[in-house]
Amino acid sequence: MQNQQEEISSTQTTTIEVLPPVLQLRASRDQPSRHDVRWGTDVIDNENMNKKKTKICCIYHPQDEDEEGCTSDHQHEEPPESSSSSSSESENDKDLGFDERRKRRVERRRRKLRDNTDSAPNAYEVQPDYSEHRKKMMEKKSNNT
C-alpha cells in the first residue's frame, strides 16, 4: 500500500538561449550628400545684405607682449627706463611664477575694465535693433502682393 501512496514526480528543465537582437544601420545610397545651411526664422539678416548670422561676433582681446603666451620669435627693443610708464609691479613679473603672473595679469585687466566702465561698448558688443527695418520689409512685401 505504501507503493500506491508514493507519487512519482519528475521535473524537466529546458534551457533556451535568447540572443539579444542586433540592429544594423546602413547609409542610404539613394540620396546624394548635400550640406546645405538652413537658416531658422529667428536668424537676423545683417543689414539686408543676405548675410545671415546667429549670434554676436566674438571680440578678440590680444595679450600684452610682456605677458605669458607670447610665442613670437622676434625681439623688441626695450624702451629706456626713464620713459617707461609701467608700474614697478610689471617689472617684477619676470621674477614670478606662472600663477602669480596670471593673478597680476587678471587683476590689471579687472582694474582696466573697472576704470573704463563709463565708456560705451563698441559696435560688436551690442546687438543692433532691426525691428524697424523688419517692419518696413514686411510692409514692402505686403504691398507687392
Curated annotation (Swiss-Prot):
Localization of this protein: Nucleus
Organism: Vanderwaltozyma polyspora (strain ATCC 22028 / DSM 70294 / BCRC 21397 / CBS 2163 / NBRC 10782 / NRRL Y-8283 / UCD 57-17) (Kluyveromyces polysporus)
Family, as annotated: Belongs to the YPI1 family.
Chain intervals with Low complexity compositional bias: 1-17
Transmembrane regions: none
One Pfam family this sequence matches: PPI_Ypi1
InterPro entries from the UniProt entry: PPI_Ypi1
Superkingdom, taxonomy of origin: Eukaryota
Keywords assigned by UniProt, alphabetized: Nucleus
Name assigned to this protein: Type 1 phosphatases regulator YPI1
Residues covered by region (Disordered): 1-41, 64-145
Comp. bias regions, Basic and acidic residues: 27-39, 91-101
Biased composition (Basic residues): 102-113
Alphabetical GO biological process terms: glycogen metabolic process; intracellular monoatomic ion homeostasis; mitotic spindle assembly checkpoint signaling; regulation of protein localization to nucleus
Summary of the function given for this chain in its UniProt record: Regulator of type 1 phosphatases which maintains protein phosphatase activity under strict control.
Listed GO CC annotations: nucleus; protein phosphatase type 1 complex
Main location: nucleus
An annotated Gene Ontology molecular function: protein serine/threonine phosphatase inhibitor activity
